């Protein structure tokens, strides 16, 4: 039912003509219905949760150095536009930029052989993740300790300004170029609208 739909138009067009067509060919066939589609905040954990999942490996593979460790934190909501952008930049500066401090700390500690990060801001409550690949399950406590000690040190002493500037420049270039590879630009703009529009109908353009 269109009462529970989101419609966006992209491109150089006669907007009045397109809106009239939508009304005549589609929307006018329906009565407006109230829809309660509000997504509520998840109740926060009182303590850190540990989740263990198994995955298949080949019979000739060893379980040694074949564990994935993941550290995940909820970061406010996607309606906080400053944090939304800040964590996109921090994700790059901490885990992707040359000499990224969090990545370097984990590699220097020998916790895994490949370190990556992600900031999933396509959900109401974005999730910042640090992932260690080719680690071992007995390293999980050290994994958490290194992450938290490194972040506390960065909070106390500051982050490398060059890394932070590189993150800002990287995202500025990406925004200016609006290059989405093989994906149509209009489609990607629409998907980005949903990062906030789904949770507050008055804020479709904050990102």
Language-model segments: which ranges?
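Charge-rich, well-structured scaffold segments of protease-associated domains
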Residues: 1-47, 59-87, 92-207
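Short amphipathic
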Residues: 49-57
């Amino acid at each position: 039912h269109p009462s529970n739909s989101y419609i966006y138009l992209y491109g150089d067009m006669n907007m009045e003509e397109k809106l009239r067509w939508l009304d005549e060919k589609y929307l006018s066939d329906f009565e407006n219905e109230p829809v309660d589609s509000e997504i509520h905040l998840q109740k926060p954990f009182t303590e850190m949760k540990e989740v263990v999942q198994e995955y298949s490996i080949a019979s000739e593979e060893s379980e040694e150095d074949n564990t994935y460790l993941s550290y995940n934190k909820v970061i406010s909501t996607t309606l906080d536009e400053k944090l939304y952008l800040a964590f996109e930049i921090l994700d790059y500066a901490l885990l992707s930029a040359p000499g990224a401090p969090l990545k370097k700390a984990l590699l220097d500690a020998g916790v895994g052989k490949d370190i990556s990060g992600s900031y999933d801001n396509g959900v109401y409550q974005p999730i910042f993740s640090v992932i260690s690949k080719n680690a071992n399950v007995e390293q999980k406590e050290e994994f958490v300790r290194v992450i938290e000690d490194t972040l506390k040190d960065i909070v106390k002493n500051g982050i490398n300004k060059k890394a932070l500037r590189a993150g800002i420049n990287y995202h500025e270039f990406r925004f200016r170029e609006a290059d989405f590879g093989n994906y149509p630009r209009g489609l990607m703009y629409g998907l980005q609208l949903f990062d906030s529009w789904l949770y507050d109908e008055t804020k479709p353009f904050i990102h």
